[in-house]
Amino acid sequence: MEIGISHYLTVSAILFTLGVFGIFLNRKNVIIILMSVELILLAVNINMVAFSAFLNDITGQVFALFILTVAAAEAAIGLAILVVFYRNRGSIAVEDVNMMKG
């Protein structure tokens, strides 16, 4: 049995669905929301690489590499903000983050 593009798209759809459900079902924990966003970005990357390989074009793979770098920067900045917020407030609940004024 050969692994075709439909297998990659199925895995990507499952990851995307898990990410969306993670955001909508768990709105209290900011870390879970960040992890769900990372799952969604990973699903997009799998789609881009799968279609890039299917169409014999390298553009999708280059875009996937750019998305990975942006996702890594987003995760690092998001976690750094959460660490500072936890040190100041003692909690990382979404309700407490919504009360920030600046």
Curated annotation (Swiss-Prot):
Give the membrane topology: Multi-pass membrane protein
- Cellular component aspect of the GO annotation: NADH dehydrogenase complex; plasma membrane
Give the record's GO biological process terms.
Answer: ATP synthesis coupled electron transport
Under Enzyme Commission nomenclature, its number is 7.1.1.-
Record-annotated membrane-spanning stretches: 5-25, 31-51, 65-85
* Domain of life according to the entry: Bacteria
User: What are the entry keywords?
Assistant: Cell inner membrane, Cell membrane, Membrane, NAD, Quinone, Translocase, Transmembrane, Transmembrane helix, Transport, Ubiquinone
Cite the record's note on assembly. NDH-1 is composed of 14 different subunits. Subunits NuoA, H, J, K, L, M, N constitute the membrane sector of the complex.
Similarity comment: family membership:
Belongs to the complex I subunit 4L family.
User: What's the protein here called?
Assistant: NADH-quinone oxidoreductase subunit K 1
Q: Which organism is it from?
A: Sinorhizobium fredii (strain NBRC 101917 / NGR234)
Lineage of producing organism: Bacteria, Pseudomonadati, Pseudomonadota, Alphaproteobacteria, Hyphomicrobiales
